[in-house]
Amino acid sequence: MASYKVNIPAGPLWSNAEAQQVGPKIAAAHQGNFTGQWTTVVESAMSVVEVELQVENTGIHEFKTDVLAGPLWSNDEAQKLGPQIAASYGAEFTGQWRTIVEGVMSVIQIKYTF
């Protein structure tokens, strides 16, 4: 199965030992595998860990949740942008969405498979 690597924010990491301890947990939260690589991107404030993700997640379990999607102005826009927004979370767009603050923020429903 095809995979790719991304850097995921991990908060400040103070040592390689700490990164090796928390990296696998962060990766698991994103359905991925920690590669062992990490770097500090803002001194004393933010580090990132490298995670390998599968292009398509498989499994028998599903979990649906709402995620922020920025302002969406119509169903047509939501249906067009929803799949890409969901993909950025490693999930699939269910087609459901709603506005939570008029003119400011909408949410889309996504489905994780694992």
Swiss-Prot record:
Main location, first listed in the record: cytoplasm
Binding site for a carbohydrate 1: 12-16, 20, 36-44
Any Pfam family matching the protein: MVL
Ranges occupied by Sequence repeats: 2-55, 61-114
UniProt-listed Gene3D superfamilies: 3.30.1490.230
UniProt effect for mutating residue 76 to A: Loss of N-acetyl-beta-glucosaminidase activity. No effect on anti-HIV activity
Induction details: Induced under low nutrient or anoxic conditions.
Gene Ontology MF: a single term: hydrolase activity, acting on glycosyl bonds
Role according to the record: Carbohydrate-binding protein that binds oligomannosides such as Man(6)GlcNAc(2) with sub-micromolar affinities. The specificity of MVL is unique in that its minimal target comprises the Man-alpha-(1->6)-Man-beta-(1->4)-GlcNAc-beta-(1->4)-GlcNAc tetrasaccharide core (Man(2)A) found in N-linked oligomannosides. Displays hemagglutininating activity on rabbit, horse and hen erythrocytes. This activity is inhibited by yeast mannan. Does not bind mono- and disaccharides.
Record remark on domains: Each monomer contains 2 structurally homologous domains with high sequence similarity connected by a short five-amino acid residue linker. Intriguingly, a water-filled channel is observed between the 2 monomers.
Entry protein name: Lectin MVL
Organism in which the protein naturally occurs: Microcystis viridis (Polycystis viridis)
